Amino acid sequence: MSWIERIKSNITPTRKASIPEGVWTKCDSCGQVLYRAELERNLEVCPKCDHHMRMTARNRLHSLLDEGSLVELGSELEPKDVLKFRDSKKYKDRLASAQKETGEKDALVVMKGTLYGMPVVAAAFEFAFMGGSMGSVVGARFVRAVEQALEDNCPLICFSASGGARMQEALMSLMQMAKTSAALAKMQERGLPYISVLTDPTMGGVSASFAMLGDLNIAEPKALIGFAGPRVIEQTVREKLPPGFQRSEFLIEKGAIDMIVRRPEMRLKLASILAKLMNLPAPNPEAPREGVVVPPVPDQEPEA
């Protein structure tokens, strides 16, 4: 027996360890491989390059509001395919697919609760639901959020992440721009603060309506914010756009937004601002949250 055969006879094969899917993920910016649980504890912010990844609507609201205080609003509202719209796929099929993928009925989630003990109403977009596009249900839920803020005499916060108006609802989608803007006028008349938080991306009809109507417009770092996208603009003007065009840092230099706030600092910053605007005691800084625990969304059958 040769020495190679002797070595081979002493080698015991081992089974390949099976790693469940979703345990690891990769940063979209720097390519760093990240432990999923650690990334969630860091509010979907890359610990290496500080890239702010997209966050689900429910995770965002649960990371903002005080635990045990959240009450969802407008969950009974569901989208309808009244136009029987069809492009490469039926609209009702797109809705069913998005509902199955995200567990949400539509692209906006609204909740009321407390922020450091202060009553607030908060709304957040679910970008994974048809690109966070604004349809009639998104508009109706936003108006519901405004009405609740007026009823409770409290501030409203909205986290935008949208590609714009939903083309499958045509004019009914476009009219939400006026509808939501008119609702916010009531907040202004009452003297109640509305803070708009612009996340990546905030585009189209959403950026052209309530997303830019905040008493304070705050953006996350490097968020893409605008009406038409950079590629569309370049093709139209036939010129190369400057580096960082339509990003948060570019917009704050031009005076289009008020401030840029990192996601881990957002909760305390919003509470501090609202306390001043509402003439309330400043919040006491607390230790960083250990993570976000989100209750499962109840099973739902998409409408045929």
UniProtKB/Swiss-Prot annotation:
Activity regulation behaviour: Competitively inhibited by pyrrolidine dione antibiotic moiramide B (CPD1).
Record bears the keyword Membrane: no
The EC number(s) this enzyme carries: 2.1.3.15
GO process terms (BP): fatty acid biosynthetic process; long-chain fatty acid biosynthetic process; malonyl-CoA biosynthetic process; negative regulation of translation
Cofactor(s) in the UniProt record: Zn(2+)
Pathway assigned to this chain's UniProt record: Lipid metabolism; malonyl-CoA biosynthesis; malonyl-CoA from acetyl-CoA: step 1/1
GO molecular function: acetyl-CoA carboxylase activity; ATP binding; carboxyl- or carbamoyltransferase activity; DNA binding; mRNA binding; zinc ion binding
Catalytic activity, as annotated: N(6)-carboxybiotinyl-L-lysyl-[protein] + acetyl-CoA = N(6)-biotinyl-L-lysyl-[protein] + malonyl-CoA
Result after altering residue 49 to A: Vmax decreases 8-fold
Subunit structure: Acetyl-CoA carboxylase is a heterohexamer composed of biotin carboxyl carrier protein (AccB), biotin carboxylase (AccC) and two subunits each of ACCase subunit alpha (AccA) and ACCase subunit beta (AccD).
Protein name (Swiss-Prot/TrEMBL): Acetyl-coenzyme A carboxylase carboxyl transferase subunit beta
The organism of origin for this protein: Escherichia coli (strain K12)
